């Protein structure tokens, strides 16, 4: 039987492979730790990070002690959308990074969808 970590890694690699086959070269990547949530807009053709936001940003960090929750995920989504808009990015591919599209991942995606299209 596969361990949970191995299942997660397989799911992550399957998602990344599907994304790499698309014509879009810019993706919105999500990472969750036990305490924080991170979002990056990455240009895979140039291998650079265009914009990044997380619960470690000073604006969001002041709000609550527990940082990886839906309220802060919405704030991170709004912040990454603002940074993408200022960088001139309108269209991205959403990379959920192996996480289920539920809870904080869904909240971040819905908040980011207000300004960027994916």
From Swiss-Prot:
GO terms for cellular component: cytosolic large ribosomal subunit. This is Large ribosomal subunit protein uL18. Part of the 50S ribosomal subunit; part of the 5S rRNA/L5/L18/L25 subcomplex. Contacts the 5S and 23S rRNAs. NCBIfam families: L18_bact. This is one of the proteins that bind and probably mediate the attachment of the 5S RNA into the large ribosomal subunit, where it forms part of the central protuberance. Keywords: Ribonucleoprotein, Ribosomal protein, RNA-binding, rRNA-binding. GO terms for biological process: translation. GO terms for molecular function: 5S rRNA binding; structural constituent of ribosome. Belongs to the universal ribosomal protein uL18 family. The keyword Transferase does not apply. It comes from Rickettsia peacockii (strain Rustic).
